[in-house]
Amino acid sequence: MTEAAAQPHALPADAPDIAPERDLLSKFDGLIAERQKLLDSGVTDPFAIVMEQVKSPTEAVIRGKDTILLGTYNYMGMTFDPDVIAAGKEALEKFGSGTNGSRMLNGTFHDHMEVEQALRDFYGTTGAIVFSTGYMANLGIISTLAGKGEYVILDADSHASIYDGCQQGNAEIVRFRHNSVEDLDKRLGRLPKEPAKLVVLEGVYSMLGDIAPLKEMVAVAKKHGAMVLVDEAHSMGFFGPNGRGVYEAQGLEGQIDFVVGTFSKSVGTVGGFVVSNHPKFEAVRLACRPYIFTASLPPSVVATATTSIRKLMTAHEKRERLWSNARALHGGLKAMGFRLGTETCDSAIVAVMLEDQEQAAMMWQALLDGGLYVNMARPPATPAGTFLLRCSICAEHTPAQIQTVLGMFQAAGRAVGVIG
């Protein structure tokens, strides 16, 4: 990699000669100033990190230094699995580098059919539709299901892709307080009974790593005659007896109308999907704009996904290692005095809560300098006034790496003044 290519894109100091009232980018002046203030403090830009080399699911080279990865969503560590890599290479040789078309035209290859069958087998459903990204899966299915005159009822802390799907579909949007069964019941009860309704939930919420009380929420939704969609992006592979997600872990098989997921986390590649047992589910392909009007995934990508999904069906040891690592990290950080996003280890996400952006940036920088990469998160990705470092644990982290990580957090926390 050349030195120039390794540098993140810089914002120009001087704006083009356009009158401010006609400059479409002037709305971002506050954001630009805030970013510059952060960089002027001497902190590396936390939102422009370059992986110069990736050595394994848990190690990379960043800024010329060997770094433990604790912020990649690579929960099951499938990115370097030999069988997964071999499947991608074979498809690349057999079908070429891309499809040059949408799924509705020439963009469905043998491996697209194979990955959708793998999803049906994994989830035990009759239907599966693959999208080019997880974001597009939510954007596509929500905007297609719920339109004008219909209602989408969603958690206030829902992912941006869920909100964008609501807006694209032009449905009425009703928000309820995060993880509040009572507020969900109240909001649904106030709506007219006649229009169709879709309740959108997430198994694991990606910022704090907390899980939804799906059992109670699904019961409320069904009481009010609403259909239910659950996004299991951050739980696929290691929640429930078959790794299907939080809904399976809470005994809700057969009660969820649509399950959304992604390939970019536990599966270890890129893409998104929706699975369902609804008898009319295939009609989504004929009406879903984000499915129809975009190029399909390259054959090598869906081939790797197929192999990974089938291996995840029996990845019992990996699941146990992931949960063991998550409990060790959560428990260790809590014992040191860090304030965490959840009281108990609820998922493979551990959020370290901090006072403000300055403290979060200093802590993040201290960890990076010590050889550890985590995600720094701030509004609007987090709730207003919430600043945190998000740790995503991997099944391939060794016990020794987890202990090293705990030592890094202790040293950085003391240096910054987060812990005593």
UniProtKB/Swiss-Prot annotation:
Keywords attached to this entry: Acyltransferase, Cytoplasm, Lipid metabolism, Pyridoxal phosphate, Transferase
Annotated Gene3D superfamilies: Aspartate Aminotransferase, domain 1 (3.90.1150.10), Type I PLP-dependent aspartate aminotransferase-like (Major domain) (3.40.640.10)
Transferase among keywords: yes
GO molecular function, one term: acyltransferase activity
Record-listed E.C. numbers: 2.3.1.50
Cofactor(s) the protein requires to work: pyridoxal 5'-phosphate
pH dependence: Optimum pH is 7.5 to 8.0.
Result after altering residue 100 to C: 23-fold decrease in catalytic efficiency for L-serine
Catalytic activity of the protein: L-serine + hexadecanoyl-CoA + H(+) = 3-oxosphinganine + CO2 + CoA
GO CC annotation terms, alphabetical: cytoplasm; membrane
Cell compartments where the protein resides: Cytoplasm
Subunit structure: Homodimer.
Name under which the protein is recorded: Serine palmitoyltransferase
Species in which this protein is naturally found: Sphingomonas paucimobilis
Gene: spt
